[in-house]
UniProtKB/Swiss-Prot annotation:
It is found in: Cytoplasm. Keywords: Cytoplasm, Protein biosynthesis. Belongs to the RRF family. The gene is frr. CDD domains: RRF. One of its GO terms (biological process) is translational termination. InterPro entries: Ribosome_recyc_fac, Ribosome_recyc_fac_dom, RRF_sf. This is Ribosome-recycling factor. PANTHER family: MITOCHONDRIAL RIBOSOME RECYCLING FACTOR PSEUDO 1 (PTHR20982:SF3), RIBOSOME RECYCLING FACTOR (PTHR20982). SUPFAM superfamilies: Ribosome recycling factor, RRF. GO terms for cellular component: cytoplasm. GO terms for molecular function: ribosomal large subunit binding.
Length: 185
């Protein structure tokens, strides 16, 4: 049976990695993705509402997103919200749908996105290492109080380090995958 401290540490590390993965999905890469619009909200009858809750968002083959609102009166609100966002895209409204065309990113833009990806992943690594630090501190406290032996402390510290290495490696893989996605497009 796994020690409860290790289970807790693993759960926290896993959640940190999942949070970073979600954040990376929202990062612009030059490739159209409905996830890019998740944070953009429009005023829907006085309530700030994400675009994906008032419209269908589809990716087309020609590097664009098609946003088809369920109510046509939302077209201009969607268009304005996208223009006001930090995506740097110019939506076009044809009266039925809002179209977002993704231009080919420049090398400079790609490098900027890779740098941003690296920063996000580094925050995840820091979070994982902080969890390790907290657990090791807790283990030392337990040894000091006589709750566990020094041998158990060393064994658990080694297992915590193995968990840390595992999740740092996962974060590195996330970075490599995102970097490849950014640079290949």
């Amino acid at each position: 049976m796994k020690d409860p401290i290790l289970k807790e540490a693993e759960l926290r590390m896993k959640k940190s990695v999942e949070a970073i993965d979600e954040e990376l999905k929202k990062l612009r890469t030059g490739r159209p993705s409905p996830a890019l619009l998740e944070e953009i909200k429009i005023d829907y009858y006085g309530v700030p509402t994400p675009i994906n809750q008032v419209a269908t968002i589809n990716v087309t083959e020609e590097r664009s997103l098609i946003i088809k609102p369920w109510e046509k009166n939302l077209l201009s609100a969607i268009e304005k919200a996208i223009q006001a966002s930090d995506l740097g895209l110019n939506p076009t409204n044809d009266g039925n749908v809002v179209r977002l065309v993704f231009p080919s990113p420049t090398t400079e833009q790609r490098q900027k996105w890779v740098k941003k990806t690296k920063e996000i992943v580094e925050h995840g690594k820091i979070a994982v290492r902080n969890i390790r630090r907290d657990v090791i501190k807790e283990l030392k406290e337990m040894t000091k109080n006589g709750e566990i032996s020094e041998d158990d402390e060393k064994r658990l510290e080694k297992e915590v380090q193995n968990l840390t290495d595992k999740y740092i490696e996962e974060l590195d893989k996330l970075f490599e995958r995102k970097e490849k996605e950014i640079m290949e497009f």
